[in-house]
From Swiss-Prot:
InterPro entries reported in the protein's UniProt record: Asp/Glu-ADT_sf_sub_c, GatC
Protein name as it appears in the record: Aspartyl/glutamyl-tRNA(Asn/Gln) amidotransferase subunit C
Organism: Maricaulis maris (strain MCS10) (Caulobacter maris)
Any one biological process term the GO annotation gives: glutaminyl-tRNAGln biosynthesis via transamidation
Oligomer and partners: Heterotrimer of A, B and C subunits.
Pfam families: GatC (PF02686)
Similarity remark: Belongs to the GatC family.
Reaction equation(s) it catalyzes: L-glutamyl-tRNA(Gln) + L-glutamine + ATP + H2O = L-glutaminyl-tRNA(Gln) + L-glutamate + ADP + phosphate + H(+); L-aspartyl-tRNA(Asn) + L-glutamine + ATP + H2O = L-asparaginyl-tRNA(Asn) + L-glutamate + ADP + phosphate + 2 H(+)
UniProt EC number: 6.3.5.-
Length: 95
């Protein structure tokens, strides 16, 4: 599979970005290079290899689940543009 200049224009239109008229030839080459690299990855034999998220296994520290109130209401409300009696004040969204 190879990318053409028309494909680059179509991708730009679908992504709703400005058509890169001065860089189309460069982008065609870059996208074809990426696709070539992906085709090389498809040739790797992975039969018998278990899917994994990381090659290094390290357990995450475990802790007991405890319900708390967070003790940071004032800090959180300090970030709000408007608050009243400990609650966020937002514009009315339903009539």
């Amino acid at each position: 599979m190879s990318v053409t200049a028309d494909d680059v224009r179509r991708i730009a239109r679908l992504a709703r970005i400005a058509e890169p008229t001065d860089r189309i030839d460069t982008l065609v080459g870059e996208l074809n290079g990426i696709l070539s690299w992906i085709e090389q990855l498809n040739e790797v034999d992975v039969d018998g290899v278990e899917p994994m998220t990381t090659p290094v296994k390290f357990p995450l520290p475990q802790r007991a689940d405890e319900v708390t109130d967070g003790n940071c209401r004032d800090k959180v409300l300090a970030n709000a543009p408007k608050s009243d009696e400990g609650f966020f004040v937002v514009p009315k969204s339903v009539e």
